Amino acid sequence: MGDPLLPGSTGLGSGGTAAATGGTGTTGTGLGSGGTSGTERPPSPARLTHTSEKHPKVTLTELNMLRRHRELCDVVLNVGGRKIFAHRVILSACSSYFCAMFTGELEESRQTEVTIRDIDENAMELLIDFCYTAHIIVEESNVQTLLPAACLLQLVEIQDICCEFLKRQLDPTNCLGIRAFADTHSCRELLRIADKFTQHNFQEVMESEEFLLLPVGQLVDIICSDELNVRSEEQVFNAVMSWLKYNVAERRQHLAQVLQHVRLPLLSPKFLVGTVGSDLLVRSDEACRDLVDEAKNYLLLPQERPLMQGPRTRPRKPTRRGEVLFAVGGWCSGDAIASVERFDPQTNDWKMVAPMSKRRCGVGVAVLNDLLYAVGGHDGQSYLNSIERYDPQTNQWSCDVAPTTSCRTSVGVAVLDGFLYAVGGQDGVQCLNHVERYDPKENKWSKVAPMTTRRLGVAVAVLSGHLYAIGGSDGQCPLNTVERYDPRQNKWVAVNPMSTRRKHLGCAVFNNYIYAVGGRDDCMELSSAERYNPLTNTWSPIVAMTSRRSGVGLAVVNGQLYAVGGFDGSAYLKTIEVYDPETNQWRLCGCMNYRRLGGGVGVMRAPQTENYMWCAK
């Protein structure tokens, strides 16, 4: 059998299709003579139903032109000294606020110039533009004025878009400010998401300036949550004391109110006595001393603990975000595929997500800046240099990434120092040693030093600031050689080879080793596996997988090593197996929805907000 990952040996060919037409006579339309049937039927009335898809857009465009030329305008909005011309009927159709203003008994219903107060004039102009164009750009510079304006005008769609934008901007340095902003404007969903984000990232949030500026009520709301994500209750106490000491004069009166929400009974005895009990501010407050005594009793009298249960003795149970694995493209049932699915180890469940715009086998996949990149591949007919990028927050692929300088399939892709590297592969003419890297800030690829050996079906890995190119084929035979790239010197050097020749192998870094599994040698698909120790520059074997797998994906998810799909010599695989380094054993742990040979795999953190769509629309 030929190499199943090389398009020339897949058995692909152009198939013929035939169409036949039958003699059905003449069909009567009411516009001419009918057929020769012996039974005459009265002609049906002529009818053509038409619904124009472009009519709404054209109409809005013309209405906006009338507004721009101040023609047929029947109202002028005076906002912050700026005059905005408009048509009442358009404003009323888009905004409940304007509808009530112009159709009721309010004085404004009879005025040709209406003054709108407490709203930013630039925001108002953007919102009126949206009413006429259905287009708006929300960005960091305008969202804080757009959202209040949209709330006032009751433009719910814009409120939702602003909240969506703010959800995507959440980080530990601004989540408290966004939370307060959401609370002020009654954006309940944004408030809930900001709360969840704050709880999950509390260890970073507590270091921010926003945290130190919190009013006491908001501080209490945060630290009383059962879902606060902390390693120990000591972090909560330290956070509270940092907040207090930021303005001791004004805040010491609130110490007992806040400290009652710190779960002192869950502290270690050493920390409780040595740190909490000895703190001068705590010792000077009677209510705080009582809280410390309560915690001491809980720790010293274990037999009494069943009678002392309460909110302060309840362990926190944070909701932890795990990692998820994506399987992208590949070869299935004789053709390249565009389908993508994700695996959640916590539920042991595979679900389909949005497919790529192109079918891709031999695709290189990597994650950069929380976005999944699919590089090159083969679509069943052509070698590709195009790239797609997946955003898990929106469940959408975008194609605005600059293409690689060469078409590449069976390419190795990895991320090093904020750059995306594309290594080797083939372009339909020859096997490649070219290497290029992508700068996401510039949306540009640039070439770096080529490898010393041409490699298709190469595996790549990043370890200790170096990029490794492992195995593959030079176009004639599989390789066991390995070379390492140093970006500081822009140079490749050879390291010790693997014990087995492997092309289309799987590769991943796990516990500071590089693992190489499966692939194909000169004769057959492989189940064997080995790992590389960079400290000793040596390869050593590990136990073989349960199945032979060429074109296998290998990835580390939540601290476990997974082998995904591949080809066993007779069938495409959808099984996955996981490796346990302590027992040196592989075990099967489920199946994908699709069989995949030569698909890419990537690992991402589950989105920090809950506003994402894993499932394909």
Swiss-Prot record:
Region named Disordered: 1-55
Kelch repeat copies, ranges: 324-370, 372-418, 419-465, 467-512, 514-559, 560-606
Keywords of the record: Actin-binding, Kelch repeat, Repeat, Ubl conjugation pathway
Ranges of Gly residues composition bias in the record: 10-37
Domain of life: Eukaryota
SMART domains on file: BACK, BTB, Kelch
Nucleotidyltransferase among keywords: no
Listed GO biological process terms: negative regulation of synaptic assembly at neuromuscular junction; protein ubiquitination
Residue span, BTB domain: 73-140
MF annotations from Gene Ontology: actin binding
All copies of domain BACK, residue ranges: 175-277
Pathway(s): Protein modification; protein ubiquitination
Annotated function: Probable substrate-specific adapter of an E3 ubiquitin-protein ligase complex which mediates the ubiquitination and subsequent proteasomal degradation of target proteins. May have a role in synapse differentiation and growth.
Protein name: Kelch-like protein diablo
Organism: Drosophila mojavensis
Gene: dbo
